[in-house]
Amino acid sequence: MTGPELVDWDLAVATGRRLVRPGPQLTRAEADEVVAELRKLAVEAEAHVVAYTHLQPQGEAPPVVVVDRKEWLRSNVAGLRSVTGPLLGKLGDRSSSGALSRSIGRRITGLQIGGALAFLAGKVLGQFEIFLPPEEVAGPGGRLSLVAPNIAEVERKIGADPRDFRLWVCLHEQTHRVQFHAVPWLRGHLESEVGAFVDATDLDPSALAARLKSAVSALRSRDG
């Protein structure tokens, strides 16, 4: 890619961090308890998944982290930037827009992405992040993130037993982590599929922007 990126990723992070809703009201002791138990239950859940599936993890295990909404948002911008980089680079090279239009467009797209991820940051309970760039996580294995404020908020809202609900979330997310940890070629396969899509795509920048706007509108229409 010879020119500026088609998305202002820094603006996406800044916008998302400004728009993301605060988490539930917790004392410091309550917050520490949630984080500590999620870390403990993540280990327990991995053992359950391995015992049930008979999948045998290989090599260094992807890390498990407990994060807040803003950190989830920031890491997802990094992952989105990594996985869409080749496609956006291809589209950027073929773009006929002038420098001013391109500068405005990349900022608008950054605002849209930040707004969409700010909404999702208050909803996601956990996520196995496959495509994080090397500077975000050591090794190529991805990372499991558990979003503590969202888990605490939902368990309160539905009146669930905290330990049971947290274990359920950990079991769900550890299933993905164990799958990728036990099948080392799976991540490379997904990367090759993404690469094949990039090579085959004939989408122009304006069409991509239109699709992004539609996706953001769909996300917002689900709020509430």
Descriptions of predicted regions:
Residues 1-58, 62-63:
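N-terminal low-complexity, Ser/Thr- and acidic-residue-enriched intrinsically disordered segments
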Residues 27-30, 34, 38, 102, ...:
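Generic alpha-helical structural element
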Residues 41-149:
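Auxiliary, metal-adjacent structural segments of Zn-dependent hydrolase domains
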Residues 48-51, 177, 181, 185:
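Active-site catalytic microenvironments for nucleophilic, acid-base chemistry
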Residues 117-125, 181-224:
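Post-HExxH zinc-binding segment in Zn-dependent metallohydrolases
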Residues 150-169:
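Short pre-active-site segment immediately N-terminal to the catalytic Zn-binding motif
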Residues 154-156, 178-179, 188:
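Short helix/loop capping segments that flank catalytic or ligand/cofactor-binding pockets
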Residues 165-181:
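Active-site recognition of the HExxH zinc-binding catalytic motif
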